[in-house]
A protein has these predicted regions:
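Acidic, polar low-complexity linker/tail segments
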Residues: 1-48, 53-61
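VWA/integrin I-like adhesion module and closely mimicked acidic/polar interface patches used
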Residues: 143-191, 209-210
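Von Willebrand factor
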Residues: 40-95, 100-142, 147-148, ...
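Surface-exposed acidic, glycine-flexible loop patches that form ligand/cofactor-binding
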Residues: 11-13, 39-40, 71-75, 128-134, ...
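Loop/turn elements at helix/coil->beta-strand transitions in domains of secreted/extracellular proteins
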Residues: 77-82, 132-139, 165-172, 191-195
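C-terminal "exit" segments of structured domains
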Residues: 190, 198-231
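Extracytoplasmic/secreted envelope proteins and their assembly/folding machinery
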Residues: 18, 44, 61, 65-72, ...
Length: 231
């Protein structure tokens, strides 16, 4: 049994133990309840990178490639790395060990450059891929932050963030241009417990995975013996 505990402000509640849970079945206490652990105990995370394929991002080829490699290195060969390219239609480009992108270049992407980027579909695809992933999970988008090419034709911002939160997926953004983050991206970051990072910062991105691991989850796993008859 997996349980997500939040307060009335939808903030995760962490630090709970077995005595904090009381399980019933048909209004009767269940037998042999066992506390299996909390997601906050995980020391690694599954990460999905979304790479912006809009035309203006091609001016920042080196910065995007550096960001991909730094995030992969920060994972320290723990967890699964996924790479999705966000163009007119999102494409899953890679699933595997973080070391698999150590020679990553934009030329290896199958998705062509596009004047229209379906960000909503890319975020939906990334979230779907993480539903059955490790308990610590995050989407990281790498982009210039210019949303003139972005479209949200199928899912609005509230639907996107709600779907992420319901599946315990946080969202962070790596900015490769020195400009302010758009209001749309800021909304998603702020409503999914994520962070904004600049590729230009002196320390680089080496702490990004540790930051994700420290995000409160409020997800717990328990087991019990059912007294209901089996079919």
């Amino acid at each position: 049994l997996e349980i997500k505990v939040e307060n009335r402000h939808r903030q995760p509640v962490v630090g709970l133990q077995e005595p904090n849970f009381y399980l019933t079945e048909n209004k009767r206490p269940v037998n042999k309840v066992k506390f299996l652990g909390a997601a906050s105990n995980n020391d690694f995370a599954d990460i999905t990178l979304i790479i912006d394929r809009s035309s203006n991002c091609q001016l920042y080829k080196n910065e995007i490639e550096t960001a991909v490699k730094e995030v992969a290195a920060a994972m320290e060969e723990k967890g699964t790395l996924r790479v999705i390219s966000a163009g007119a239609i999102p494409v899953t480009e890679y699933i595997g060990k973080p070391s698999g992108v150590q020679n990553f270049t934009l030329e290896t992407l199958k998705n062509p450059v596009s004047e229209n980027v379906s960000v909503d579909l890319a975020l939906r695809l990334a979230t779907n891929d993480l539903i059955n992933a490790e308990k610590k999970r995050s989407i990281i988008m790498i982009s210039g932050g210019n949303t003139n090419n972005y479209s949200y034709s199928k899912y609005n911002l509230a639907e996107i963030t709600s779907y992420m939160n319901n599946n315990s997926v946080c969202f962070s953004f790596i900015q490769v241009m020195q400009n302010a983050l758009s209001s749309e991206m800021s909304y998603i970051v702020n409503n999914t417990c994520g962070e904004l990072y600049y590729i230009f910062r002196p320390e680089g991105l080496k702490n990004i995975i540790n930051d994700i691991l420290e995000i409160p989850q409020g997800v717990y796993q328990l087991s019990y013996t059912s007294s209901l008859p089996t079919n």
